[in-house]
């Protein structure tokens, strides 16, 4: 399964991301296929996504590398190591963002019935850009809220 690391500190803004990067390196064995990061500043309501040294080359041209740009004023930070099971392409990169950038999802597990859920969400008008269960989970959340978990079969964390 994948690996997730993160922290939240509402009282104090942090800028250094090296601790997050080190934590994610420690769990690299949990996900050899990719790594990704998302950091959030609750005061300014801004977010930044990062790739890492083990991210696919195509992603490195789309976002900054956490090693080369290790500073962002933030309160909340997540790192993710990906072990690809369903969609093996870079399109399954996590943290996974909604099309408008308002929702960010980190997901560890496998949704066995994601194809059935995807068909239902397609009928409701959602347009998918990947073949991964992560996007199905996010689309389900945007459609049904936390009730999406009631419809998912499989191990989810």
Where in this protein do the model-derived segments appear?
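Conserved phosphate/oxyanion-binding catalytic-loop motifs
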Residues: 109
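N-terminal glutamine amidotransferase
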Residues: 1-106, 139-157
């Amino acid at each position: 399964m994948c690996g997730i690391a993160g922290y939240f500190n509402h009282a104090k803004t942090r800028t250094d991301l090296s601790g997050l990067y080190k934590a994610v390196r420690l769990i690299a064995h949990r996900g050899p296929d990719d790594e990704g990061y998302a950091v959030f500043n609750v005061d300014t309501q801004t977010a930044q996504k990062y790739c890492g040294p083990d991210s696919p080359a195509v992603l490195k041209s789309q976002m900054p590398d956490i090693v080369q740009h290790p500073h962002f004023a933030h309160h909340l930070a997540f790192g993710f190591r990906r072990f690809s099971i369903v969609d093996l392409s870079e399109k399954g990169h996590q943290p996974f963002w909604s099309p408008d950038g308002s929702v960010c999802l980190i997901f560890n597990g496998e949704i066995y019935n994601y194809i059935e859920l995807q068909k239902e969400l397609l009928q409701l008008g959602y347009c998918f850009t990947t073949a991964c269960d992560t996007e199905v989970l996010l689309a389900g959340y945007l459609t049904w809220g936390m009730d999406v978990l009631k419809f998912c079969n499989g191990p989810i964390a």
